[in-house]
Amino acid sequence: YPENIGMVFWSGANMRSHGQCIAEFLYLMGIRPKYQSGSLRINGLEVIPLMELKRPRIDVTARISGLFRDTMPSVMQVMDKAVLLAAEQDEPEDLNFVRKHIQEDTKELEQQEGMEHDAAWRQAAFRVFGDAQGTYGAGVAALLESKNWETIDDIADVYVRWGGHAYGGKTKGKFLPQQFRKRMGSLDITIKNEDNHETNMLSSDDYNAYHGGMIAAVRSIKGSAPRSYCGDSTDR
């Protein structure tokens, strides 16, 4: 199983599909929503036992769009809580990659940055990243159009700078480029889901900017290309 997956989250696709990317994010981590009786309102989260899951909990990093940030703030909180819940489980490292990586990064922040444990854990656990408040885009499209780049490292730097704002809990867009860069450099797989035939990756440069930018960042930082997938749920 891959230890780290990066996903691109757009608002419109999740509205139309009733949250397919959100559900995928939760399930990869082995977390499921608890629904209020008699409705589809989520009133909590619960852990899927490893015996039922039959695989490790996979670490997922979300790169959200500016519109996703604006339209789904409560969903971002659910996603953040799911990460923390998965990380709290006292399970073997080879069966809980979320906990494994957060523990490793927490220790690194304590030793190298001198951070207190709770603050280091909180920073290490951010998995929802996007633009700064009030801004939109991945930065890559403008960079390519202006021809103001020379190597893939330039594209990666712009992608990290634009997307390196963390969301979760009381944090609303804290600029943590090194944390986001570390997440990008760890990815084994990248995913961008498509839910209809109205648009496709040849219709807009946003596909290249968000997903292509993520792939470029992984190639630059990690030194090798991730496996990259475009999920197709148009026949749902």
Regions found by a protein language model. Give the residues of each.
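Ligand/cofactor-recognition surfaces for anionic moieties
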Residues: 1-236
